[in-house]
Curated annotation (Swiss-Prot):
CDD domains: GDC-P. One of its GO terms (biological process) is nucleoside metabolic process. Keywords: Oxidoreductase. Belongs to the GcvP family. N-terminal subunit subfamily. Its EC number is 1.4.4.2. The glycine cleavage system catalyzes the degradation of glycine. The P protein binds the alpha-amino group of glycine through its pyridoxal phosphate cofactor; CO(2) is released and the remaining methylamine moiety is then transferred to the lipoamide cofactor of the H protein. This is Probable glycine dehydrogenase (decarboxylating) subunit 1. GO terms for molecular function: glycine dehydrogenase (decarboxylating) activity. It holds the Pfam family GDC-P. The lineage of its organism: Bacteria, Pseudomonadati, Thermomicrobiota, Thermomicrobia, Thermomicrobiales. It catalyses: N(6)-[(R)-lipoyl]-L-lysyl-[glycine-cleavage complex H protein] + glycine + H(+) = N(6)-[(R)-S(8)-aminomethyldihydrolipoyl]-L-lysyl-[glycine-cleavage complex H protein] + CO2.
Length: 448
């Protein structure tokens, strides 16, 4: 195809049509100094030189590929099978966007359908949407779909043991809405009991929001929470760590009405904290309140199976006041990564990963508990994270560890008032015994 740019005559006729003589007159409102600013750029270099310079910069970073990491708190260092990245790189999939003529892209729709099916199997729920942005926004959307002002249900009760960032996002979502948020205080045990939340639940409560395992890694009594919430007509919203569900009972079997979660652990690298993947699944009775998109399977006139977008209740497609959310593009590419990851591991593979996380974290806890002046904090079972009380400022300890090539845990005082002496430590299937022993000796040295 031959491209013919505008000729001088074409430009002259266009300028005459809009009533100006010169092109520069169109930009008269912009100060001259800003029209063509002189940028302080270095001299041009070759592609090979650029690559070498960027590589040198990147080598200044601490990578979990070369550094022992005990940092979790929502973003976890799990192994990603090579097949996940290979499939993501395929040109047919390498976009996060859902096509505007979706039925033309049967491969994309089937991948999302499989994602929804896997999430339902994992969580024990009846319906899942096509993904959300991350665990925090998924939790906020999951809580809001329970709110019903016409029924007088406009109060959200949130366990203090839910991730602080998730609670912050929920407060942001509800700002300006006729919704009140009540937070249940964090007990010294770092594990809430059903009786702890009962006094905060009443006829105005839309839902109770908890985490499973909670922010401190402890496993709380979901069935007890569900019983307390349902007794007052409220729903139970549970934010999950998907890998833990390889060992733990699905929240759907324990009475959860809405399940949300962060899917980064399902085949997505940490990558400085993003991109992530939001999981949102509910009981079928709430399907009309689900935000985002929902893919379904059907049969065409010739009897052939096909996939269609059955629900997309967002403001681009229906009246704004009727939309369930203003979420636009979902995390389609990351949902594909999770689909390939779960399909590759299978039920037994996921259980094996969860078992490794569990046993390595408990070995780490046992070793630290033997250190003088160090205490493992919390009550009840935990999965792969736990809090410890440090004999020295956790931030100073982390700086000491980093000098020795170890990424320490999260200094909880940075997120939770009153927990300045606590550190949250994590272990995954990639954590080795040698790394754990090296951390313990470094902690011993740091507080000698």
């Amino acid at each position: 195809m031959v491209f013919s740019p505008h000729t001088a005559d074409d430009r002259a006729r266009m300028l005459q049509e809009i009533g100006v003589e010169r092109l520069e007159e169109l930009f008269a409102a912009i100060p001259a100094s800003y029209r063509f600013p002189q940028l302080d750029l270095p001299p041009a270099i070759s592609e090979a030189e650029i690559y070498r310079e960027l590589l040198e910069w990147s080598m200044q970073n601490f990578s979990t590929a070369t550094t022992a990491s005990f940092l979790g708190a929502g973003s976890y260092n799990h192994y990603v099978p090579a097949v996940v990245q290979q499939i993501l790189w395929r040109g047919e999939f390498y976009t996060a966007y859902t096509p505007y003529q979706p039925e033309v892209s049967q491969g994309t729709l089937q991948a999302i359908y499989e994602f929804q099916s896997l999430i339902c199997l994992l969580t024990g729920m009846e319906v899942s949407n096509a993904s959300m942005y991350d665990g925090a926004t998924a939790l906020a959307e999951g809580a809001l779909l329970c709110v019903s002002p016409p029924r007088g249900r406009n109060k959200i009760v949130v366990a203090g043991t839910v991730h602080p960032h998730y609670r912050s996002v929920l407060r942001t979502y509800t700002r300006g809405l006729p919704v009140s948020i009540v937070e249940v205080p964090i007990p010294e045990t770092l594990r809430l009991q059903p009786n702890d939340v009962a006094q905060y639940l009443d006829d105005a409560t839309a839902c109770l929001v908890v985490q499973y395992p909670n922010f401190y890694g402890r496993i709380e009594d979901l069935a007890g929470f569900a019983e307390r919430a349902h007794a007052v007509g409220a729903r139970l919203v549970v934010s999950v760590y998907p890998i833990a569900l390889g060992l733990l009972r699905p929240p759907g079997e324990l009475g959860a009405d809405v399940v949300t979660g962060e899917g980064q652990c399902l085949g997505i690298p940490q990558s400085f904290g993003g991109p992530a993947l939001g999981i949102l699944a509910t009981r079928m009775e709430l399907v009309r309140h689900l935000p985002g998109r929902l893919i379904g399977a059907t049969v065409d006139r010739e009897g052939k199976r096909g996939f269609v977008m059955v629900l997309q209740t967002r403001e681009q497609h229906i009246r704004r006041e009727k939309a369930t959310s203003n979420i636009c593009t979902n995390q389609g590419l990351m949902a594909l990564a999770a689909t390939v990851y779960l399909s590759t591991l299978g039920k037994q593979g996921l259980r094996k990963v969860a078992e490794l996380c569990y046993h390595k974290a408990h070995y780490l806890a046992e070793r630290i508990a033997d250190l003088p002046a160090w205490n493992v904090i919390g009550d009840g079972p935990f999965f792969n994270e736990f809090a410890v009380r440090c004999p020295r400022d956790p931030r100073e300890i982390n700086a000491f560890l980093l000098e020795r090539g170890i990424i320490g845990g999260l200094a909880l005082g940075d997120l939770v008032p009153g927990q300045q002496d606590l550190m949250l430590l994590c272990a995954t299937e990639l954590t080795t015994r040698e790394q754990i022993d090296r951390l313990v000796e470094a902690l011993r040295e740091a507080t000698a």
